[in-house]
Amino acid sequence: MTDTTNSIKHVISPLARQTLQDRDLTRPVAGKRPIRLLPWLQVVKIGGRVMDRGADAILPLVEELRKLLPEHRLLILTGAGVRARHVFSVGLDLGLPVGSLAPLAASEAGQNGHILAAMLASEGVSYVEHPTVADQLAIHLSATRAVVGSAFPPYHHHEFPGSRIPPHRADTGAFLLADAFGAAGLTIVENVDGIYTADPNGPDRGQARFLPETSATDLAKSEGPLPVDRALLDVMATARHIERVQVVNGLVPGRLTAALRGEHVGTLIRTGVRPA
């Protein structure tokens, strides 16, 4: 038998013999942005609090989305809402770890997505699971103008254990997808006009001041409640494509349409991305 040991070809790569913790390996490309995979994509995250309101909120929003389809190709992502809060409460009482709570909440977001997709089914819109969004979104959006998915990132049992409540929820997941695809934009649709200095529906609503524009850095310093995930502010700091996110009131007809057309109708949150 011929000894072929010495004929094995070595892979010529600076990564082959180095630790991936060596920052010198990525320094030559550190200042370059990754390519935009889907630069025409608009990502719209529908908050669970909007879905919780039922037909009064959902039907006008569905009609607005239907009218937007000729203008944009959309990835519509849904949050979980009050049902996730209930499952968190039960799970915490039972002592479930954060990694067990995360997929439970994600399933509630998926239910909202199925509802929204059913309402838009006549337009060729369907619900797709995480693997399809990750690997086949382009082909789906070449066949139809929009798809619906869960906004929760699939951390599930890999969720960070530092908190009892899963920190990476719907807003964070929507942003991670939008930035990974190099989307044209991300609009977060909630039940408030945007970001306030205090909860506009809480006991301190009299002191709540509306913020038409702010930054992830400034919001991270605030201690009050926010209508978006705190973890969203962390991932914004290391974003590669999405320069700003707009939070708008989905209960006001026309706000989402205006936002997707580039109008300032809510709160603009600047990320850590520098303009190209």
From Swiss-Prot:
Keywords: Cytoplasm, Metal-binding, Molybdenum, Storage protein
Native source species: Azotobacter vinelandii (strain DJ / ATCC BAA-1303)
Annotated GO CC locations: cytoplasm
Chief subcellular location: cytoplasm
Quaternary structure annotation from Swiss-Prot or TrEMBL: Octamer consisting of 4 alpha and 4 beta chains.
Xref: InterPro entries: AceGlu_kinase-like_sf (IPR036393), Asp/Glu/Uridylate_kinase (IPR001048), MoSto_subunit_alpha/beta (IPR030669)
UniProt key word Cytoplasm: yes
UniProt name for this protein: Molybdenum storage protein subunit alpha
Keyword Metal-binding included in the entry's annotation: yes
